Amino acid sequence: MTAEQTKRFKYWQWRTIIGTMIGYAIFYFVRKNFSFAIPGLTAEYGISKTTFGVIMTLVGLIYGVSKFVNGVLADRTNGRWHMVTGLSVCSVINFIFGCGAIICAWITGQTYGTTFIHTLVVLFGVLLILNNMFQGCGFPPCNRLITHWVPPKELATKMSIWNASHSIGAFIIAILCGYLMGHTGTDMTGDPEMRQRVVENTASITEKMNAASAEAYVTNALQHVGAWQWTFWVPAAIAVLGVIFIIVTLRDTPKSVGLPELEGTKTQLDEHDSSEEFKAFLRKKVFLNPMIWGLAVADFFVYIVRFAVLDWGPTFLQESRGLSSSMAGWTVAIFEVCGITGMLLAGWISDKFFGGRAQRTCVFCMAGVILFISLFFALPESTDPVVLLMMLAVAGFFIYGPQALIGVIASNHATKKAASTANGVVGMVSYVSVVVSGWGFGFISDHFGWRWVFITMIAMAVLGFLVLLSMWNTKSDGYEHDAAETN
């Protein structure tokens, strides 16, 4: 490239990274908002957590399959328009979510009662499945875009920066939905019928509280009846703005803005190859590539540990270590913040010291996970809460390295022509982990106690460590390098 081309390329490279970060964070706005509506739906309609739990487990599996399907599509489509399609549909679905009670009232002719609630649950279940099918249009096209704009030797560092979009999106939507649930809705504290309904629907929650806390909980729900609707409508509106932002900001490949393609990313394919040649390339680089399947298995174990801490950490700290719900809740925030730090450092180390061989960084990270989860488990019940949180925080620091880098390794080995398909395979396998981390650990905790939850978690981390260790000497990417490049 000429000096002018290099300057333009850097501009478009960072424009693509930042644009996809913002775009993907907005996908989180219309995906992670549902959990904030659950307390309102429970109070107003009595929908149980068990019902929500079954739906959310199914949704996690659907999302994993969607990442695979959209990964295959992303390698053959324009990344910008792929994202636009997915986010547009998700914004419409979220608007329908907010109108769910109105739609069910129109269908059933009722505003409450068994038939109405069953209809509402079915509607929400269908919408959640559809929403997560189109949520799969988020990461795969982002991955395609970035692998076309970032050289393999820089991908670990810059993809680690990009991966912060997950936490940024989750952080902002938590603040936004928390505000909406506390400042919108209709005040119905003076309606005795609604009060009786809320008292009955929240009985399983308030029975564990003292009288003053129970009254405050019920009163808060009555002051914000219908607030849950705004946790869908406002993110849906933001998603519409996000669609416009993506259209204006992103372009598909360097060639689309008059720039040459990345050096050092030569493959057996070019843009004129036939469909049959592309399928053969996918078979070689993805479906029959033991490296991709090894990474998928490793990511399965990584996700088990990550989701176990996020889903069960606060509960364990309250039940087994006697922490308050407020203190236990900080575990998720601290885990995420330290995870971002670990993710950025892991990416930099991979490129700086291991020449892009990110699997070596992952090995050290998994060793850290094993060490600090084991230390956390071994601490006595009398341990200071700050020490407990520090142990989990350091575990988060280490676990987010592999969580980000496994996708980078898959992209480099499948090459930019099949990166999204490879990440789709890895993502699909990793999301099967929700069965173990969700239902599995819940079952183990109920029947065998927390001790065996942690023993199982540590065993999963060890297996992930061994799988990644077996890849130690694997080359850094799957591109066809000239002799001059490899010397």
Regions found by a protein language model. Give the residues of each.
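Glycine-rich segments within core transmembrane alpha-helices of 12-TM secondary carriers
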Residues: A156-G185, G339, G427-S437
